């Protein structure tokens, strides 16, 4: 409870807009869409944001009196084609100058920056690390070099937001994305993302003397997509 950096924060007014002041529900209907336009420019997505929504009293309808049924806390979590949870068990983190006894984390969450870019945290830094913003790196998916109907490969451009960590790319980072249909459920598409990279960085938090690390390996994400559902955000089985 003392870690205020992990608290959900109220989404600033400049980052959203209601396209209409009211939501019209025809008689006999139980649900209706209420469009909200989000603006993520300048929003720090290292933090967790919520937008409270309340159904207000009005003489033209009867609201549900059950406690909590008129209020929702909308967790604002943008996504793009590359964001999500990646398995990081094939990404080894070594002390600089060593190839033995690597450190490994189970997962790495990629957050949205823009349509073709995500960010995550280097090495063993977790999403709830108190110093996580110091170790943020942006990963941009460049245009595919090779592309077929079911597969594409290309290069990654990776940059650190904080020069103090002395982030350096080693070699040429790449991505590979391919689709496979499920053998038992023919409507279900499996989309796999593999990111291959090697980089070095300094941990500047623990002491006055930085500790250097080298990370090498790959990250893997699988998305399951129901091809029978036309809306992309609804088709993904999160």
Give residue spans per PLM region.
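Intrinsically disordered, low-complexity regulatory regions in eukaryotic proteins
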Residues: 2-24, 33-50, 56-238
